[in-house]
């Protein structure tokens, strides 16, 4: 974290205003000089804000981020708002480092209680590279990236990324443009090619596409509007692929419009202790071109509550439905899949529901729910350090995946979704990898197994970001 320096000011008293939790205490450092007037509880005026180190960054971009500093009325507010402005500047992704210096005003126009705030910034290089690893849903990948940050001086960036994974290889070029003064409102365009292998379906899929999306907040919700055009090539992964998979092979062109809404009040995205998450997605394909037509809806709900002894009770519910439009049936590439260590544990990856000769075909409707209890490790080894990354995990999962006859009514649909419910229970260990991903090692007992389901009875390992 950066440091807020204040010159020509006496140190704050030990019983001064609260700066927040002890974890935030190192965010503010005061460098005093002796025999100066104490301004802590007196009104002050921020007369000038200076920037040192600006090169290609435009003035209007940074001016919007530091506007609140001028509204500060006392020293404490100046320091708080300066730190908040620093965080906003770093969020733009155009500076490597930002330091804040607070000093008394000097010069003919200086007033006795006037302050100058100086932001010392270091811009990123015009071209940066990166190498890292990424964890997906039970998949790992190596990612190489090349980025052109702050391309035109207003936080635009262009990124080229190549990813090589255990089941997927991709590369793409993207352009990102935020709205000046409102970083949450942004626009992006992407060109990409993705080749994936899906052994549970004996399927190989290659997507070549372009997409454009707009992100914007409304009150406490975040929204995304997206158009995507994809040329999809489906093929058999093995000679033993079923005849149904061979029928699905070939080329399709999908053009779709989608909208997603997210409400997230959780205190963390990985292993939260409190708060809730709601995601709702809609996708409409066919009305903007292409030879694939459908309406797709799905949602995700998660609730978390902290209990005694640092335990957390978490409940989650997923669901979705795909309705083909016209006479053409849905494609295997658009259907839902269920099962595996990240959804209904105790079953193999995406190995629940309709199948043909051992190849899983997905379904047009599904639901899945889970109840989880996370507790600290017994006897709390490594408490306050590495041991806090581990949690004991007890779970109960259930769900179903099927195809619906849309000539029937909603009552028949609900009855079909309530039939043949798969469920499982078990316990294990969870490891949190920062705020990026998590690993699970569980002992699972699958129940409600139906003919054709592939189970994982016993120890099951899972890695990913999104878990039921």
Curated annotation (Swiss-Prot):
Pfam family, any one: Omp85
Domain POTRA: 44-124
Entry keyword set: Membrane, Mitochondrion, Mitochondrion outer membrane, Transmembrane, Transmembrane beta strand
Bilayer topology: Multi-pass membrane protein
Cellular-component GO terms for this entry: mitochondrial outer membrane
Annotated disulfide bonds: none
Chain intervals for the UniProt region annotation (Disordered): 1-24
Regions that span the bilayer: none
Location(s), subcellular: Mitochondrion outer membrane
UniProt record, GO biological process: cristae formation; mitochondrial respiratory chain complex assembly; protein insertion into mitochondrial outer membrane
Function in brief: May play a role in the maintenance of the structure of mitochondrial cristae.
Domain notes: Its C-terminal part seems to contain many membrane-spanning sided beta-sheets, that have the potential to adopt a transmembrane beta-barrel type structure.
Assembly mode: Associates with the mitochondrial contact site and cristae organizing system (MICOS) complex (also known as MINOS or MitOS complex).
Annotated family: Belongs to the SAM50/omp85 family.
Official protein name in the record: Sorting and assembly machinery component 50 homolog A
Source organism: Xenopus laevis (African clawed frog)
Organism lineage: Eukaryota, Metazoa, Chordata, Craniata, Vertebrata
Annotated gene: samm50-a
């Amino acid at each position: 974290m950066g440091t807020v320096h204040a010159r020509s000011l006496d140190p704050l008293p030990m019983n001064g205003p609260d700066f927040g939790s002890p974890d935030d205490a190192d965010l503010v450092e005061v460098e005093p000089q002796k025999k100066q007037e104490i301004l802590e509880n007196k009104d002050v005026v921020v007369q000038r804000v200076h920037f040192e180190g600006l090169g290609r960054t435009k003035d209007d971009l940074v001016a919007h981020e530091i506007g609140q500093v001028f509204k500060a009325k006392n020293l404490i507010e100046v320091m708080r708002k300066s730190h908040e402005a620093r965080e906003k500047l770093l969020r733009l992704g155009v500076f490597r480092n930002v330091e804040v210096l607070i000093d008394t005003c000097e010069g003919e126009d200086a007033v006795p209680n006037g302050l100058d705030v100086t932001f010392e910034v270091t811009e990123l290089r015009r071209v940066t590279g990166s190498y890292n690893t990424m964890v997906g849903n039970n998949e790992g990948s190596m990612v190489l990236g090349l980025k052109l940050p702050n391309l035109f001086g207003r936080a635009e960036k262009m990124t080229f990324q190549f990813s090589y994974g255990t089941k997927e290889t991709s590369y793409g070029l993207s352009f990102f443009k935020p709205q000046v003064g409102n970083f949450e409102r942004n626009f992006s365009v992407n060109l990409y090619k993705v080749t994936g292998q899906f052994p549970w379906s004996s399927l190989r899929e290659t997507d070549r596409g372009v997409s454009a999306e707009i992100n914007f907040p409304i009150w406490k919700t975040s929204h995304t509007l997206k158009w995507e055009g994809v040329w999809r090539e489906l093929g058999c992964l093995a000679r033993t692929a079923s005849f149904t998979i061979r029928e699905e092979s070939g080329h399709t062109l999908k053009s779709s419009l989608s909208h997603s809404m997210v409400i997230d009040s959780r205190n963390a995205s990985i292993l939260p202790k409190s708060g809730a998450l709601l995601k709702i997605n809609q996708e409409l394909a066919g009305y903007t071109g292409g030879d694939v037509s459908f309406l797709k809806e799905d949602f995700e709900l998660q609730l978390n509550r902290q209990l005694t002894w640092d335990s957390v009770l978490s409940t989650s519910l997923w669901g979705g439905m795909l309705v083909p439009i016209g006479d053409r049936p849905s494609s295997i590439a658009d259907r839902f899949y269920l099962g595996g260590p990240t959804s209904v544990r105790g079953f193999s990856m995406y190995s629940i529901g309709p199948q043909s000769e051992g190849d899983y075909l997905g379904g047009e409707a599904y639901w899945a729910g889970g109840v989880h209890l996370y507790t600290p490790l017994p006897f709390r080894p490594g408490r306050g350090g590495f041991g806090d990354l581990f949690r004991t995990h007890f779970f109960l999962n259930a769900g179903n995946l099927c195809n619906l006859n849309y000539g029937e009514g909603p009552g028949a649909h609900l009855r079909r979704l309530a039939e043949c419910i798969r469920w499982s229970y078990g316990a294990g260990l969870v490891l949190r990898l920062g705020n990026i991903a998590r690993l699970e090692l569980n002992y699972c007992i699958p129940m409600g197994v139906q003919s054709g389901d592939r189970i994982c009875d016993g120890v099951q390992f899972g890695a990913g970001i999104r878990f039921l």
